[in-house]
Amino acid sequence: MNLCCGCFVRPLFLYERSFNMYTLKTNASFDSAHFLAGYEGKCSNIHGHHWTVEIEVGSNSLEMGGNNRGMIVDFSRLKTDLKNIADALDHCLIVEIGSLKRRTLDVLEEEHFKVVEVMFRPTAENFAKFFYEEMKQKGYHVLKATVYETPNNCAAYME
């Protein structure tokens, strides 16, 4: 042990872990358009992405009985819950509340365009936090949510 500022500090070795955990990952995708209000650059214009969302959940233990014995959760339930959230954003224009004039929104509605207003600037980073929180509200122990706006560019959120 090392003495530092009057306290004992235990050296941390890379092979030491304080817990064991099982993890599951699944993904869903959706296509949508967005723009970044107030951004100086190309992303201030309406443009689209094929978004992919990857969610990772974990547990220190597995189900001990029933249909899910030996599992954290059934993959089909995890995939369905994530897909339902992604499907609500599929083939729409995602806008930050207050970023478009009311009359613009009214015209889009009259033309039967699907517009989804969100409380955040629609960046990959904010979508990662959004999916993390939505899945957490469904009762999952979410470890990490990753959102790809292109195959090579992604943002992640974890707590």
Regions found by a protein language model. Name each.
Residues 17-159:
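Charge-rich, low-complexity N-terminal segments
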Residues 7-20:
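Short, Lys/Arg-enriched N-terminal segments with co-localized hydrophobic residues
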Residues 5-8, 44:
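Secreted/luminal cysteine- and crosslink-motif detector
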